[in-house]
Amino acid sequence: MSVEKALKDLVKTGVYAMGFKQSLKAVKAGEAKAIVIAENTPPELRRKLEYYAKLAGIPIIVYRGTRMDMGLVMGRRHGVSVLAVIDEGSSRILEQAEEA
């Protein structure tokens, strides 16, 4: 399954926190099971997320596309740099982390 298909399924059936602040909050609270990050996420945000994800033992899935592409896949009209997967629903997005 591709990351794009998994993201679409996550939006329909899962629970997630969207955006840098909400995703970081979910990681710090121990709610996040994985982080999905767009390829062109600003380096300073990416470093901070990678640091906290590593401390929490949470995998990071890199979406091979821009923030705008990721937002469009999720049905948004704006870019999405980061999202935290709280409950994958039927998306099987966590398998993407295992393959990475």
From Swiss-Prot:
Taxonomy, superkingdom: Archaea
Q: Cite a GO CC annotation.
A: cytosolic large ribosomal subunit
Disulfide-linked positions:
none
- Molecular function, one GO term: RNA binding
Establish whether keyword Ribosomal protein is in the entry. yes
Biological process according to GO? translation
Which SUPFAM superfamilies is this protein grouped with?
L30e-like (SSF55315)
- InterPro entries, per database record: Ribosomal_eL30, Ribosomal_eL30-like, Ribosomal_eL30-like_sf, Ribosomal_eL30_CS, Ribosomal_eL8/eL30/eS12/Gad45
Q: Which UniProt keywords apply?
A: Ribonucleoprotein, Ribosomal protein
Record family assignment: Belongs to the eukaryotic ribosomal protein eL30 family.
Name under which the protein is recorded: Large ribosomal subunit protein eL30
Which source organism does the UniProt entry give? Aeropyrum pernix (strain ATCC 700893 / DSM 11879 / JCM 9820 / NBRC 100138 / K1)
Lineage of the organism = Archaea, Thermoproteota, Thermoprotei, Desulfurococcales, Desulfurococcaceae
Q: Which gene encodes it?
A: rpl30e
